[in-house]
Amino acid sequence: MEAQFMYEKNINIIMGNQIATSYVRKRDCYNQLKGFMQHEYPGKICALYGLRRTGKTVMMYQYISELSDKDKEKTVYILCLRECDMLELRQAMEDLYDKGVRNFFLDEITEVTDFQKYGNTFSDYFAAKGAKIVIAGTDSLGIMLAQSDILYDRIQMIHTSYIPFAEFSKLIENDSVDEYIEYGGTLTKSPYKTLQASEEYQNTAIVGNILHSLEKSEDARRYGAAITELYEQNELKSVLNKMINKFSYYTTVKAVNKCFKSAPLYSTIHNIQEPSYVSLINTEEANQATKNALGIKDLDEMQTSLSKRHLDELKNYLLELELFLEIPSYISLNSGERSEDLEIFMQPGMIYAHSTALIKNLADDSMWKDTCGIADRNLFILRADHFVKGILLENIILAETYKTFQKIDLDRYYVSQLSITLRNNNQHVEADMILVDKQKGESYLFEVKYSNQIVIDQTKHLRNTDFLEYIDENFGKVKSRLVLYTGASSKQNDVLYLNAATYLKRLSIVSNTPRPE
């Protein structure tokens, strides 16, 4: 009885016939879980690998609830609590195995203090005896570290962090791009419109995920020496937020080391000509308040001397957590002339927090000059919010298109962004996205606009004959020019306007080059 008390103290055990869930709609990756459970994978376990609020626990519940009554009797859901260790968990599992349990769903496995050291017990002992084991945990990086070490070649990973727009739309039954952005690209119960919600997610799901995983690693210094240094000086979140605030497609140490200037604040000031907000906003106060809200430190306030090693290590872990995407970029695809790779933050909530922080601070009267009226305040706040959503819409469309066509044919399709200065006339031209079918020698040019209005200026680059000739010569003959925006689909002077939500939903089912018609 003493041993039983020990393991029940640190884990919660729920038998399969006690599991029920009201969630009917399923993640697209659910069939991968079903496939693992219904087929033989000798000596292997399955891991639901992803950030918080991406449906891992719900998927476990859904699978268990659909089992027959007979199979439910052979199934158990175990929730690991803090201070649980592998000895306690193994004792509980052996007892259950002796009673006929063969399906083990182990949630919050990264709470097990020595999981990264003894996690191969699941594969080498229980799975080898014919048990089916599915694990999941909040600190998903800990699972990745185990996969690269003690569970190498013994684990099937099901990735849950990335929730494309179409899947999000299906799960919550809403086609709004705004909802997707405001909910942070996760399956949370409430939108990330409050700074507290977005900050809590960043602290726990991202920063905490990295640090807790490294703390439980036998070789934390080998895996994350630079990250650990930033954490010890309480500067990791600051560096992460300064990377995000650049709102650019390439982050450097020099850029992160610059004094913080809120991108939504300064970009909105410079993009609104009338009225001139230079004389209406207490800019320095608003910037400082936003900086404080995001926990950002400037170079002279940091104890750590930020280096390329720090930045590269942080980027690497963000890649492992599926929060970061690197997209190859070319100045000329035909000649092979490269430009810097694009770097995109995949989790909208991380970026939308910057808009949330600014807007919250702009609610304070002290941020405005006495000459600024309520209407002007509201206009500025709306435009600042639209600025961030515009950046996010570009990121979402570019990332989802890239991932889709990489999956269809890695070698045939090229998807990236293009921004160049034409050498013959010194014109600066750009496309928010270019899609090239290398097999056919065809190019598609896209502008992405967070707007429901058709404005002629939106297509100035798409109508630039010098730019089109450059694309023909360096990427492939321009087949079609498109604007992706939030309005209704239509056609204006050979330029197609497609609704962004409609386009993103088509991406989920496309199996070849998308045909605008």
Can you describe what each PLM-predicted range is?
Residues 1-37:
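N-terminal pre-Walker A segment at the start of P-loop NTPase domains
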Residues 56-57:
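Conserved lysine of the Walker
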Residues 97-119:
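Conserved P-loop NTPase "ATPase switch" module shared by AAA+ and STAND
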Residues 125-147:
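Sensor-1/coupling segment of RecA-like P-loop NTPase cores
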Residues 146-284:
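Interdomain motor-coupling "hinge/lid" segment immediately C-terminal to the ATP-binding subdomain
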Residues 218-431:
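Accessory nucleic acid-recognition modules appended to NTPase machines
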Residues 397, 401, 431-457:
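Conserved catalytic cores of phosphodiester-cleaving nucleases, focusing on short active-site segments
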Residues 482-517:
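Domain-level recognition of nuclease-like catalytic cores that cleave nucleotide substrates
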